[in-house]
């Protein structure tokens, strides 16, 4: 089946098949216009959007049976709003903010209020490993515990805001269940971060 197509104007891959169909139709129109002198009769372009042309069926058959298998995982690293991308980055999305220096005064005040220096260092180490890409090789998970108002949800919300589009929400209890066939559903797109607020780890050994 169709997986993704490179969109040069965006500098990103697209997993939306409609983008592929529109791009193919556009290229067909350009070819027909540039080569009309080569044809004696009127040229009719068999567009993808026209179901009666049969091209959409041929396209699906090609994707399913004839296209060479060249699968590559998308979005396995962070792309910031100011990151220059190429095909080889295999990115289909960007974060909505740039990676650049700035003031962290408000963040610094919040973190120093909620967490001890040691706890903060561990949390920021984990966040940093995601930014650098090391988390894919480290593959660790953090458990935040404590009473209400101790900052558990605060840092998780910050992480979600930092990695919008790159995280998923999972159910720890379901992961430890042998009867839940969809326990790993949250990980099917290989998110860089998986988060659960108020999780139950009693089933994980």
List the model feature ranges, each with a label.
Residues 1-18, 71-192:
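P-loop NTPase catalytic core of nucleic-acid-dependent motor ATPases
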Residues 190-205:
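Conserved AAA+/SF3 P-loop NTPase catalytic/coupling segment centered on the Walker-B
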Residues 1-90:
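Intein modules and their embedded homing endonuclease domains
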